[in-house]
Amino acid sequence: MNSCVKFLAGLACASAIVASPARAQDECNPEQNAPQFLGRAFFAVQKGIATLNNSGDPATDARTAIRLLTDPEARDRDKNVSGQAFTLGQALALLLTQSSAPVNGTRADFGFATDREQSADLYVIADSVFTVVETLIPLCADQVSAWRQGPPWVGTMNKALTALSEGKLDTAEALARRALILDRRAPYAYVVLGGAARQRLAAASAADKPRYLAESRGHLTRVLEMAQNDTSYRDVVRSSHYELGELGAASLAGAPAAERATRAREAAEHFKQYAVLAESDLQRADALQKMGDVFAEVGDTASIRAIYGGVSSNPTGYGERALLTSGILATRFGTPVEAAALYNAVLSTNPYNRDALRNQAVTLIKLNDFAGLLPISQRLTALDPNNPENWVFHAYAYAGMAERTSNAAMRRAYTDSSTKYDRMATAMPMKVTFTEFSPMEAEARIRGTIENLGTSPQTYTIIVEMLDRSGNVLATEQAQVGPVAAKATGEFTVLGKATGVAAFRYKPLL
Protein backbone atom coordinates (compact mmCIF):
# COMPACT_ATOMS: atom_id res chain seq x y z
CA MET A 1 0.00 0.00 0.00
CA ASN A 2 2.98 2.34 -0.22
CA SER A 3 2.36 5.42 1.90
CA CYS A 4 -1.02 4.26 3.15
CA VAL A 5 -1.01 4.54 6.92
CA LYS A 6 -3.56 2.96 9.19
CA PHE A 7 -6.57 4.99 8.10
CA LEU A 8 -5.67 4.90 4.42
CA ALA A 9 -5.70 1.13 4.50
CA GLY A 10 -9.46 1.51 4.60
CA LEU A 11 -9.44 3.91 1.68
CA ALA A 12 -7.43 1.50 -0.43
CA CYS A 13 -9.82 -1.30 0.42
CA ALA A 14 -12.74 0.87 -0.64
CA SER A 15 -11.24 1.22 -4.10
CA ALA A 16 -11.63 -2.52 -4.58
CA ILE A 17 -15.37 -2.63 -3.90
CA VAL A 18 -16.35 -2.62 -7.57
CA ALA A 19 -14.21 -5.65 -8.26
CA SER A 20 -15.45 -7.57 -5.23
CA PRO A 21 -19.28 -7.68 -5.30
CA ALA A 22 -19.60 -10.87 -3.21
CA ARG A 23 -18.97 -9.82 0.41
CA ALA A 24 -20.21 -10.93 3.80
CA GLN A 25 -23.30 -9.15 5.06
CA ASP A 26 -21.58 -7.86 8.20
CA GLU A 27 -18.79 -5.98 6.39
CA CYS A 28 -18.51 -2.24 5.88
CA ASN A 29 -19.62 -2.28 2.23
CA PRO A 30 -21.79 0.74 1.31
CA GLU A 31 -23.01 1.25 -2.25
CA GLN A 32 -20.84 3.96 -3.85
CA ASN A 33 -21.72 3.81 -7.57
CA ALA A 34 -25.27 5.18 -7.60
CA PRO A 35 -26.74 7.74 -8.02
CA GLN A 36 -24.57 8.90 -10.89
CA PHE A 37 -23.04 11.90 -9.08
CA LEU A 38 -22.00 9.55 -6.26
CA GLY A 39 -20.29 7.20 -8.71
CA ARG A 40 -18.37 10.14 -10.19
CA ALA A 41 -17.36 11.27 -6.70
CA PHE A 42 -16.24 7.75 -5.83
CA PHE A 43 -14.12 7.65 -8.98
CA ALA A 44 -12.47 10.94 -7.91
CA VAL A 45 -11.73 9.42 -4.50
CA GLN A 46 -10.13 6.40 -6.16
CA LYS A 47 -7.97 8.70 -8.27
CA GLY A 48 -6.93 10.55 -5.11
CA ILE A 49 -5.93 7.30 -3.43
CA ALA A 50 -3.84 6.31 -6.44
CA THR A 51 -2.21 9.75 -6.48
CA LEU A 52 -1.38 9.51 -2.79
CA ASN A 53 0.05 6.03 -3.21
CA ASN A 54 2.38 7.48 -5.83
CA SER A 55 3.49 10.20 -3.37
CA GLY A 56 1.34 12.83 -5.04
CA ASP A 57 -1.08 15.43 -3.68
CA PRO A 58 -4.66 14.07 -3.48
CA ALA A 59 -6.20 17.48 -2.74
CA THR A 60 -7.57 18.16 -6.24
CA ASP A 61 -9.33 14.81 -6.52
CA ALA A 62 -10.65 15.08 -2.95
CA ARG A 63 -12.07 18.56 -3.65
CA THR A 64 -13.70 17.26 -6.83
CA ALA A 65 -15.41 14.51 -4.88
CA ILE A 66 -16.57 16.94 -2.19
CA ARG A 67 -17.93 19.38 -4.81
CA LEU A 68 -19.90 16.61 -6.50
CA LEU A 69 -21.25 15.33 -3.20
CA THR A 70 -22.39 18.76 -1.99
CA ASP A 71 -23.85 20.06 -5.27
CA PRO A 72 -27.47 20.96 -4.42
CA GLU A 73 -28.50 20.59 -8.08
CA ALA A 74 -27.35 16.98 -8.38
CA ARG A 75 -30.09 14.53 -9.43
CA ASP A 76 -31.35 12.04 -6.87
CA ARG A 77 -29.66 13.79 -3.96
CA ASP A 78 -32.08 12.14 -1.58
CA LYS A 79 -31.06 8.63 -2.60
CA ASN A 80 -28.37 6.45 -1.01
CA VAL A 81 -27.61 8.96 1.73
CA SER A 82 -25.38 6.51 3.56
CA GLY A 83 -23.24 5.92 0.46
CA GLN A 84 -22.93 9.68 -0.03
CA ALA A 85 -21.86 10.17 3.58
CA PHE A 86 -19.29 7.39 3.41
CA THR A 87 -17.74 8.71 0.20
CA LEU A 88 -17.65 12.24 1.60
CA GLY A 89 -15.87 10.80 4.64
CA GLN A 90 -13.31 9.20 2.34
CA ALA A 91 -12.74 12.48 0.54
CA LEU A 92 -12.23 14.36 3.79
CA ALA A 93 -9.89 11.65 5.03
CA LEU A 94 -7.83 12.26 1.89
CA LEU A 95 -7.71 15.98 2.63
CA LEU A 96 -6.60 15.21 6.17
CA THR A 97 -3.56 13.29 5.00
CA GLN A 98 -0.53 14.53 3.06
CA SER A 99 -2.45 17.05 0.95
CA SER A 100 -2.02 20.76 0.30
CA ALA A 101 -5.40 21.59 1.82
CA PRO A 102 -5.28 24.07 4.73
CA VAL A 103 -6.59 23.11 8.14
CA ASN A 104 -8.49 26.38 8.49
CA GLY A 105 -9.98 28.31 5.58
CA THR A 106 -13.23 28.75 3.72
CA ARG A 107 -15.57 26.00 2.65
CA ALA A 108 -14.40 26.65 -0.91
CA ASP A 109 -10.86 25.70 0.13
CA PHE A 110 -12.18 22.23 0.88
CA GLY A 111 -14.28 21.91 -2.28
CA PHE A 112 -17.76 22.48 -0.87
CA ALA A 113 -20.32 23.68 -3.39
CA THR A 114 -22.45 25.56 -0.86
CA ASP A 115 -21.71 28.52 1.44
CA ARG A 116 -18.31 28.71 -0.18
CA GLU A 117 -17.12 31.89 1.56
CA GLN A 118 -18.04 30.69 5.03
CA SER A 119 -15.11 30.10 7.40
CA ALA A 120 -14.46 26.47 8.13
CA ASP A 121 -12.24 24.20 10.19
CA LEU A 122 -11.30 20.97 8.42
CA TYR A 123 -11.12 19.08 11.73
CA VAL A 124 -14.64 20.16 12.70
CA ILE A 125 -16.08 19.40 9.26
CA ALA A 126 -14.42 15.99 9.18
CA ASP A 127 -15.68 15.16 12.66
CA SER A 128 -19.24 16.08 11.67
CA VAL A 129 -19.16 13.92 8.56
CA PHE A 130 -17.46 11.02 10.32
CA THR A 131 -20.14 11.13 13.01
CA VAL A 132 -22.85 10.93 10.35
CA VAL A 133 -21.16 7.88 8.81
CA GLU A 134 -20.87 6.20 12.22
CA THR A 135 -24.58 6.84 12.79
CA LEU A 136 -25.85 5.78 9.36
CA ILE A 137 -23.52 2.80 8.89
CA PRO A 138 -22.58 1.33 12.30
CA LEU A 139 -20.69 -1.50 10.60
CA CYS A 140 -18.21 1.09 9.33
CA ALA A 141 -17.25 2.33 12.81
CA ASP A 142 -13.81 0.72 12.64
CA GLN A 143 -13.20 2.26 9.22
CA VAL A 144 -14.13 5.69 10.51
CA SER A 145 -11.97 5.21 13.59
CA ALA A 146 -9.02 4.65 11.26
CA TRP A 147 -9.83 7.90 9.44
CA ARG A 148 -10.05 9.76 12.72
CA GLN A 149 -6.66 8.50 13.88
CA GLY A 150 -4.87 9.47 10.69
CA PRO A 151 -1.64 11.49 10.33
CA PRO A 152 -3.14 14.86 11.42
CA TRP A 153 -4.38 13.36 14.67
CA VAL A 154 -1.10 11.50 15.23
CA GLY A 155 0.91 14.64 14.49
CA THR A 156 -1.21 16.76 16.80
CA MET A 157 -0.92 14.23 19.62
CA ASN A 158 2.85 13.96 19.20
CA LYS A 159 3.18 17.73 19.38
CA ALA A 160 0.99 17.77 22.49
CA LEU A 161 3.12 15.13 24.19
CA THR A 162 6.30 17.00 23.27
CA ALA A 163 4.90 20.25 24.64
CA LEU A 164 3.93 18.47 27.85
CA SER A 165 7.43 17.05 28.30
CA GLU A 166 8.88 20.54 27.72
CA GLY A 167 6.55 22.10 30.29
CA LYS A 168 4.64 24.16 27.68
CA LEU A 169 1.34 23.44 29.34
CA ASP A 170 -0.92 25.91 27.51
CA THR A 171 0.29 24.56 24.18
CA ALA A 172 -0.02 20.95 25.30
CA GLU A 173 -3.59 21.44 26.49
CA ALA A 174 -4.62 23.32 23.33
CA LEU A 175 -3.18 20.61 21.09
CA ALA A 176 -4.78 17.82 23.13
CA ARG A 177 -8.18 19.46 22.84
CA ARG A 178 -7.57 19.96 19.13
CA ALA A 179 -6.86 16.25 18.76
CA LEU A 180 -10.10 15.47 20.60
CA ILE A 181 -12.06 17.09 17.76
CA LEU A 182 -10.95 14.31 15.43
CA ASP A 183 -10.91 11.38 17.84
CA ARG A 184 -12.44 10.97 21.28
CA ARG A 185 -11.95 7.22 21.63
CA ALA A 186 -8.19 7.00 22.11
CA PRO A 187 -7.02 7.95 25.62
CA TYR A 188 -3.90 9.91 24.71
CA ALA A 189 -5.40 13.40 24.75
CA TYR A 190 -6.62 12.79 28.30
CA VAL A 191 -3.14 11.57 29.24
CA VAL A 192 -1.82 14.98 28.15
CA LEU A 193 -4.58 16.90 29.92
CA GLY A 194 -4.05 14.90 33.09
CA GLY A 195 -0.29 15.39 32.91
CA ALA A 196 -0.66 19.13 32.39
CA ALA A 197 -3.00 19.43 35.35
CA ARG A 198 -0.55 17.47 37.48
CA GLN A 199 2.31 19.78 36.55
CA ARG A 200 0.14 22.77 37.39
CA LEU A 201 -0.72 21.12 40.70
CA ALA A 202 2.96 20.90 41.63
CA ALA A 203 3.38 24.68 41.29
CA ALA A 204 -0.08 25.76 42.43
CA SER A 205 -0.95 27.85 45.43
CA ALA A 206 -2.74 26.20 48.31
CA ALA A 207 -6.01 27.68 47.10
CA ASP A 208 -5.61 26.25 43.59
CA LYS A 209 -4.34 22.80 44.51
CA PRO A 210 -7.79 21.20 45.00
CA ARG A 211 -8.85 22.31 41.51
CA TYR A 212 -5.79 20.94 39.76
CA LEU A 213 -5.92 17.75 41.81
CA ALA A 214 -9.51 17.19 40.74
CA GLU A 215 -8.70 17.99 37.10
CA SER A 216 -5.75 15.64 36.95
CA ARG A 217 -7.59 12.81 38.68
CA GLY A 218 -10.60 13.33 36.43
CA HIS A 219 -8.60 13.16 33.22
CA LEU A 220 -6.54 10.15 34.30
CA THR A 221 -9.63 8.33 35.53
CA ARG A 222 -11.12 8.97 32.10
CA VAL A 223 -7.99 7.40 30.58
CA LEU A 224 -8.58 4.22 32.59
CA GLU A 225 -12.25 4.10 31.63
CA MET A 226 -11.31 4.30 27.96
CA ALA A 227 -8.25 2.06 27.96
CA GLN A 228 -8.43 -0.59 30.67
CA ASN A 229 -10.31 -3.15 28.56
CA ASP A 230 -8.06 -2.78 25.52
CA THR A 231 -4.78 -4.68 25.77
CA SER A 232 -3.18 -2.44 23.14
CA TYR A 233 -3.27 0.34 25.74
CA ARG A 234 -1.54 -1.69 28.46
CA ASP A 235 1.30 0.84 28.80
CA VAL A 236 -1.16 3.72 29.11
CA VAL A 237 -3.19 1.89 31.75
CA ARG A 238 -0.08 1.02 33.74
CA SER A 239 1.29 4.57 33.72
CA SER A 240 -2.13 6.04 34.55
CA HIS A 241 -2.44 3.82 37.61
CA TYR A 242 0.99 5.01 38.71
CA GLU A 243 0.10 8.68 38.15
CA LEU A 244 -3.17 8.31 40.05
CA GLY A 245 -1.34 6.58 42.87
CA GLU A 246 1.16 9.43 43.02
CA LEU A 247 -1.64 11.99 43.04
CA GLY A 248 -3.37 10.19 45.89
CA ALA A 249 -0.14 9.92 47.86
CA ALA A 250 0.65 13.61 47.34
CA SER A 251 -2.82 14.60 48.55
CA LEU A 252 -2.49 12.86 51.92
CA ALA A 253 -0.57 15.61 53.68
CA GLY A 254 -3.29 18.21 53.28
CA ALA A 255 -6.29 15.89 53.41
CA PRO A 256 -8.90 16.15 56.18
CA ALA A 257 -8.32 13.55 58.87
CA ALA A 258 -11.55 11.76 57.99
CA GLU A 259 -10.41 11.26 54.38
CA ARG A 260 -6.79 10.25 54.86
CA ALA A 261 -7.32 6.51 55.29
CA THR A 262 -9.64 6.33 52.28
CA ARG A 263 -7.23 8.27 50.10
CA ALA A 264 -4.36 6.04 51.19
CA ARG A 265 -6.33 2.93 50.25
CA GLU A 266 -7.22 4.41 46.86
CA ALA A 267 -3.61 5.37 46.16
CA ALA A 268 -2.38 1.94 47.25
CA GLU A 269 -4.91 0.22 45.00
CA HIS A 270 -3.58 2.15 42.00
CA PHE A 271 -0.02 1.16 42.91
CA LYS A 272 -1.22 -2.43 43.29
CA GLN A 273 -2.68 -2.37 39.77
CA TYR A 274 0.56 -0.84 38.53
CA ALA A 275 2.41 -3.78 40.08
CA VAL A 276 0.07 -6.26 38.36
CA LEU A 277 0.88 -4.65 35.00
CA ALA A 278 4.57 -4.13 35.76
CA GLU A 279 7.01 -5.11 33.03
CA SER A 280 9.98 -5.57 35.33
CA ASP A 281 10.99 -6.54 38.82
CA LEU A 282 12.14 -2.95 39.35
CA GLN A 283 8.67 -1.57 38.58
CA ARG A 284 7.05 -4.12 40.88
CA ALA A 285 9.47 -3.25 43.68
CA ASP A 286 8.72 0.44 43.19
CA ALA A 287 5.00 -0.25 43.47
CA LEU A 288 5.45 -2.21 46.70
CA GLN A 289 7.51 0.62 48.16
CA LYS A 290 4.88 3.19 47.18
CA MET A 291 2.14 1.10 48.75
CA GLY A 292 4.14 0.88 51.94
CA ASP A 293 4.76 4.62 51.94
CA VAL A 294 1.09 5.62 51.63
CA PHE A 295 0.00 3.28 54.40
CA ALA A 296 2.88 4.45 56.59
CA GLU A 297 1.69 8.03 56.06
CA VAL A 298 -1.61 7.17 57.76
CA GLY A 299 -0.19 4.72 60.29
CA ASP A 300 -1.83 1.65 58.76
CA THR A 301 0.80 -0.94 59.66
CA ALA A 302 -1.67 -3.81 59.25
CA SER A 303 -1.95 -3.05 55.55
CA ILE A 304 1.83 -2.81 55.25
CA ARG A 305 2.18 -6.24 56.80
CA ALA A 306 -0.35 -7.55 54.30
CA ILE A 307 1.82 -6.18 51.48
CA TYR A 308 5.03 -7.93 52.44
CA GLY A 309 3.10 -10.91 53.77
CA GLY A 310 1.68 -11.53 50.32
CA VAL A 311 5.19 -11.54 48.89
CA SER A 312 6.55 -13.73 51.67
CA SER A 313 3.84 -16.33 51.06
CA ASN A 314 4.83 -16.62 47.38
CA PRO A 315 8.51 -15.66 47.10
CA THR A 316 9.04 -17.50 43.82
CA GLY A 317 6.48 -15.20 42.21
CA TYR A 318 8.69 -12.15 42.70
CA GLY A 319 12.12 -10.98 41.61
CA GLU A 320 14.97 -10.08 43.93
CA ARG A 321 14.22 -6.35 44.03
CA ALA A 322 10.61 -6.90 45.00
CA LEU A 323 11.72 -9.40 47.63
CA LEU A 324 14.32 -6.96 48.94
CA THR A 325 11.77 -4.15 49.14
CA SER A 326 9.40 -6.42 51.02
CA GLY A 327 12.20 -7.32 53.41
CA ILE A 328 12.83 -3.65 54.10
CA LEU A 329 9.11 -3.16 54.81
CA ALA A 330 9.24 -6.11 57.20
CA THR A 331 12.30 -4.58 58.88
CA ARG A 332 10.47 -1.28 59.38
CA PHE A 333 7.01 -2.51 60.26
CA GLY A 334 7.23 -6.21 61.08
CA THR A 335 9.51 -8.59 62.93
CA PRO A 336 13.15 -9.59 62.39
CA VAL A 337 12.02 -13.15 61.71
CA GLU A 338 9.80 -11.98 58.84
CA ALA A 339 12.53 -9.75 57.47
CA ALA A 340 15.16 -12.50 57.66
CA ALA A 341 12.96 -14.87 55.66
CA LEU A 342 12.58 -12.31 52.89
CA TYR A 343 16.31 -11.51 52.76
CA ASN A 344 17.00 -15.24 52.60
CA ALA A 345 14.62 -15.41 49.62
CA VAL A 346 16.65 -12.69 47.89
CA LEU A 347 19.91 -14.51 48.55
CA SER A 348 18.51 -17.79 47.27
CA THR A 349 17.88 -15.98 44.00
CA ASN A 350 21.11 -13.98 43.97
CA PRO A 351 23.74 -14.96 46.57
CA TYR A 352 25.78 -11.85 45.72
CA ASN A 353 23.14 -9.19 46.39
CA ARG A 354 25.03 -6.69 48.59
CA ASP A 355 21.95 -4.98 49.97
CA ALA A 356 20.37 -8.26 51.01
CA LEU A 357 23.61 -9.42 52.66
CA ARG A 358 23.96 -6.17 54.57
CA ASN A 359 20.32 -6.05 55.66
CA GLN A 360 20.44 -9.69 56.67
CA ALA A 361 23.53 -8.99 58.79
CA VAL A 362 21.69 -6.25 60.68
CA THR A 363 18.64 -8.51 61.07
CA LEU A 364 20.67 -11.41 62.46
CA ILE A 365 22.15 -9.10 65.10
CA LYS A 366 18.59 -8.27 66.19
CA LEU A 367 17.87 -11.99 66.36
CA ASN A 368 21.07 -12.64 68.35
CA ASP A 369 21.99 -15.19 65.67
CA PHE A 370 25.73 -14.53 65.78
CA ALA A 371 26.71 -17.92 64.42
CA GLY A 372 24.52 -17.20 61.38
CA LEU A 373 25.89 -13.66 61.15
CA LEU A 374 29.50 -14.67 60.58
CA PRO A 375 29.08 -16.41 57.18
CA ILE A 376 26.88 -13.55 55.99
CA SER A 377 29.48 -10.95 56.99
CA GLN A 378 32.20 -13.02 55.33
CA ARG A 379 30.26 -13.05 52.07
CA LEU A 380 29.69 -9.31 52.37
CA THR A 381 33.34 -8.43 52.95
CA ALA A 382 34.35 -10.64 50.02
CA LEU A 383 32.27 -8.33 47.82
CA ASP A 384 32.91 -5.04 49.61
CA PRO A 385 36.26 -5.26 51.46
CA ASN A 386 36.96 -1.55 51.96
CA ASN A 387 33.86 -0.50 53.82
CA PRO A 388 34.83 -0.51 57.52
CA GLU A 389 31.21 -1.04 58.55
CA ASN A 390 31.23 -4.50 56.98
CA TRP A 391 34.13 -5.62 59.17
CA VAL A 392 32.25 -4.43 62.22
CA PHE A 393 29.79 -7.26 61.53
CA HIS A 394 32.70 -9.69 62.00
CA ALA A 395 33.41 -8.06 65.37
CA TYR A 396 29.74 -8.34 66.37
CA ALA A 397 29.61 -11.99 65.33
CA TYR A 398 32.64 -13.02 67.36
CA ALA A 399 31.61 -10.91 70.35
CA GLY A 400 28.16 -12.49 70.33
CA MET A 401 29.56 -16.00 70.11
CA ALA A 402 32.00 -15.20 72.94
CA GLU A 403 29.11 -14.23 75.20
CA ARG A 404 27.24 -17.43 74.48
CA THR A 405 29.91 -20.09 74.74
CA SER A 406 30.65 -21.90 77.99
CA ASN A 407 34.09 -22.98 76.77
CA ALA A 408 36.68 -20.61 78.23
CA ALA A 409 39.24 -21.23 75.49
CA MET A 410 36.69 -20.57 72.77
CA ARG A 411 35.53 -17.44 74.61
CA ARG A 412 39.07 -16.06 74.58
CA ALA A 413 39.53 -16.94 70.91
CA TYR A 414 36.23 -15.32 69.95
CA THR A 415 37.07 -12.23 71.98
CA ASP A 416 40.48 -11.94 70.34
CA SER A 417 38.89 -12.21 66.89
CA SER A 418 36.27 -9.61 67.77
CA THR A 419 38.99 -7.22 68.92
CA LYS A 420 41.01 -7.90 65.77
CA TYR A 421 38.17 -7.03 63.39
CA ASP A 422 37.07 -4.04 65.43
CA ARG A 423 40.59 -2.63 65.19
CA MET A 424 40.73 -3.47 61.48
CA ALA A 425 37.55 -1.48 60.88
CA THR A 426 38.81 1.45 62.95
CA ALA A 427 42.21 1.53 61.26
CA MET A 428 41.01 1.21 57.66
CA PRO A 429 42.44 4.22 55.76
CA MET A 430 39.60 4.54 53.26
CA LYS A 431 35.89 3.86 52.92
CA VAL A 432 34.23 2.74 49.68
CA THR A 433 30.53 3.48 49.34
CA PHE A 434 28.27 2.71 46.40
CA THR A 435 25.51 5.09 45.32
CA GLU A 436 24.21 3.34 42.20
CA PHE A 437 24.07 -0.12 40.70
CA SER A 438 22.07 -0.16 37.47
CA PRO A 439 22.16 -3.48 35.61
CA MET A 440 20.71 -3.09 32.12
CA GLU A 441 20.19 -5.39 29.17
CA ALA A 442 23.72 -5.22 27.77
CA GLU A 443 25.65 -3.23 30.36
CA ALA A 444 25.78 -2.30 34.02
CA ARG A 445 26.62 1.07 35.56
CA ILE A 446 28.11 1.44 39.03
CA ARG A 447 28.70 4.71 40.82
CA GLY A 448 30.32 5.27 44.17
CA THR A 449 32.69 7.26 46.31
CA ILE A 450 35.99 6.66 48.08
CA GLU A 451 36.49 8.57 51.30
CA ASN A 452 40.09 9.20 52.31
CA LEU A 453 40.17 8.54 56.07
CA GLY A 454 43.91 9.12 56.26
CA THR A 455 46.02 12.21 56.84
CA SER A 456 47.53 12.77 53.37
CA PRO A 457 46.21 12.95 49.78
CA GLN A 458 45.73 9.60 48.05
CA THR A 459 44.98 8.34 44.55
CA TYR A 460 43.06 5.08 44.24
CA THR A 461 42.52 2.58 41.44
CA ILE A 462 39.35 0.59 42.00
CA ILE A 463 38.97 -2.61 39.96
CA VAL A 464 35.37 -3.80 39.71
CA GLU A 465 34.24 -7.24 38.56
CA MET A 466 30.72 -7.66 37.18
CA LEU A 467 29.16 -10.97 38.26
CA ASP A 468 26.27 -13.15 37.21
CA ARG A 469 24.09 -14.93 39.78
CA SER A 470 26.52 -17.83 39.89
CA GLY A 471 29.48 -15.60 40.69
CA ASN A 472 31.06 -15.82 37.25
CA VAL A 473 32.98 -12.72 36.18
CA LEU A 474 31.33 -11.23 33.09
CA ALA A 475 33.39 -8.05 32.79
CA THR A 476 36.17 -6.24 34.63
CA GLU A 477 36.43 -2.46 34.68
CA GLN A 478 38.52 0.00 36.64
CA ALA A 479 38.50 3.66 37.55
CA GLN A 480 41.12 5.99 38.96
CA VAL A 481 39.99 8.23 41.78
CA GLY A 482 42.00 11.15 42.98
CA PRO A 483 44.09 12.58 44.19
CA VAL A 484 41.65 12.73 47.10
CA ALA A 485 42.57 15.09 49.91
CA ALA A 486 42.69 13.85 53.49
CA LYS A 487 39.20 13.56 55.02
CA ALA A 488 37.69 14.26 51.56
CA THR A 489 35.74 12.11 49.10
CA GLY A 490 36.26 11.27 45.43
CA GLU A 491 33.62 9.93 43.05
CA PHE A 492 33.87 7.20 40.43
CA THR A 493 31.76 5.56 37.74
CA VAL A 494 32.39 2.28 35.94
CA LEU A 495 30.40 0.89 33.02
CA GLY A 496 30.62 -2.80 32.26
CA LYS A 497 29.60 -4.04 28.82
CA ALA A 498 28.04 -7.40 29.58
CA THR A 499 24.70 -9.18 29.53
CA GLY A 500 23.26 -10.78 32.64
CA VAL A 501 25.08 -8.73 35.29
CA ALA A 502 23.42 -9.38 38.66
CA ALA A 503 26.05 -8.23 41.16
CA PHE A 504 29.58 -6.92 41.49
CA ARG A 505 32.65 -6.95 43.71
CA TYR A 506 35.92 -5.06 43.76
CA LYS A 507 39.46 -5.96 44.57
CA PRO A 508 40.74 -4.70 47.95
CA LEU A 509 42.36 -1.28 47.84
CA LEU A 510 45.91 -1.39 49.16
Model-predicted regions and their roles:
Residues 47-63, 93-170, 196-238, 248-269, ...:
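Short coil/linker segments at helix-helix boundaries
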Residues 77-79, 138, 184, 228, ...:
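Short coil turns that delineate tetratricopeptide repeat
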Residues 72, 133, 178-179, 222-223, ...:
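Canonical positions in the second alpha-helix
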Residues 472-500:
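Intrinsically disordered, low-complexity Pro/Gly/Ser/Thr-rich segments with frequent PxxP/GP/PP motifs
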Residues 83, 87-88, 94, 158, ...:
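Canonical tetratricopeptide repeat
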Residues 42, 83, 154, 188, ...:
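Start-of-helix register in tetratricopeptide repeats
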Residues 94, 165, 199-202, 243, ...:
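Register position in tetratricopeptide repeats
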Residues 26-42, 76-78, 140-158, 231-234, ...:
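TPR-adjacent "capping" and linker segments in tetratricopeptide-repeat scaffold/adaptor proteins
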